[in-house]
Structure formats: C-alpha cells, structure tokens
Regions:
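AAA+ P-loop NTPase catalytic core and its hallmark functional loops
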Residues: 1-152, 168-180, 184-208
Length: 208
C-alpha cells in the first residue's frame, strides 16, 4: 500500500496508488520546490519490504531514473526534489534494527536532548525560577549517568520535552513530572539496581 496496493472497490478489489506514489507524483509536477516525506519511527516497519523494488530509486545516483513497476507495468521514478526523513526511537528495544541495505541509503544524525540549546534556555529564562534551573541541572547530571551506563546509553537520556509547553512554572507541576514521568522511567531502567534508583529519587526530590 505504500507504493501501490489492491483495495476494496465495489464487489472486488482495485489497484490504487499508495501515499508515496502520490507524493512523488506531486513532487514531480513541481520540481523547483523541495518535498519532505517524513516517516515517524521508521524502524517500526520492515522498510526493505515496504520500499521493495524502489529501494534502489531512493539513492541519490538513481533519482529521476525510471523503473517499471511490477504492480502495473508503468514507469516510475523518485524525483530529485524528494527528501525522505526517517525518525527512530533507538531506546525501544522491541523495534527492528535498520538493515544495512536501507542504512547505506540514508545519512544519520543523532538528536540529543535540547537542554543546552538556545531555545530551551530562552524558555527557561522566561520563568526565572531557581527551582526550575536547579531541576534541569540535575536532569543533565542524570543524563550523563544514563549515557555512560553500558546497558543503556545516550538513546535512553531524558528528553527536554517533559519540561516544555508550560505557560506557568510551579513546584506542583515540576514535582508531578519527576514523580509520574521521570522516576517511573528510572525504575524501568535500573530495575535491578535499587540503590541507584534510591540515589536519584533522593537527588530529584531534594530539589524541592
């Protein structure tokens, strides 16, 4: 269904264009404009099977070159102005790894927690709350310990989004994030290290 697929139509099935096929057609008709196709949690599916025969066409050296589709016998190409962005959650161990055939067709960029970014510090400064500053520093310390843990790594670090989107900064809100989001996660991370869990419970609760 990603490229093409048979879907119910009346009393039977009809071959219909899939979302990526339609997207490429639209991009092909407007090649002066970049088109970005974003796949969230790309490693939830078997991308080699999903792209199938088109796997070669997403390579930069084959952009614009036509391939006859097995679905309908018609030529198809991936335009040069199509950019495929795949997002992965490397911390979810239940998900499939990206195989090498697909991996070599992509460049990779790690998105680290944005606690040190200019945007987050502007957000932090807008509250001018000493407790909030202190809590974020402790979270950064926590992330350092998570990142160096050989059983976890940087993919398991606490993201800044837990602390974003607030119009008002209160101790009640910060405590709720710690108690109901951060600490339960640490209990999963270090389920066999109760002393480490207790240590970070004391540190984070001690901010208040």
């Amino acid at each position: 269904d990603f490229i093409m697929g048979y879907k119910p139509s009346g009393e039977g099935f009809e071959l219909q264009n899939g979302i990526f096929y339609k997207f490429c057609q639209k991009a092909s008709n407007n090649q002066e404009v970049p088109y970005f196709f974003i796949i969230d949690e790309i490693n939830r599916g078997n991308m080699s099977k999903i792209f199938g025969e088109l796997l070669m066409l997403i390579e930069k050296d084959y952009r614009g070159k036509k391939l006859t589709l097995a679905y309908n016998g018609l030529p198809f190409s991936v335009p040069k102005n199509v950019y495929i962005i795949g997002m992965m959650n490397t911390a979810d161990r239940s998900l499939a790894l990206i195989d090498y055939a697909l991996r070599r067709r992509f460049s990779f960029f790690a998105m680290e927690p944005g606690f040190s970014s200019d945007g987050f510090w502007q957000y932090l400064d807008s509250f001018n709350d000493d407790t909030f500053y202190a809590l974020i520093e402790k979270i950064k310390d926590l992330n350092f310990e998570i990142a160096k843990d050989p059983s976890l790594g940087s993919g398991f670090c606490i993201g800044h989004s837990y602390f974003c989107g607030q119009d008002e900064c209160t101790d009640e809100w910060m405590q709720s994030v710690v108690e109901y989001d951060i600490l339960p996660m640490l209990e999963e991370y270090w389920f066999d290290e109760p002393a480490k869990i207790q240590k970070w419970q004391n540190i984070l609760r001690g901010v208040f």
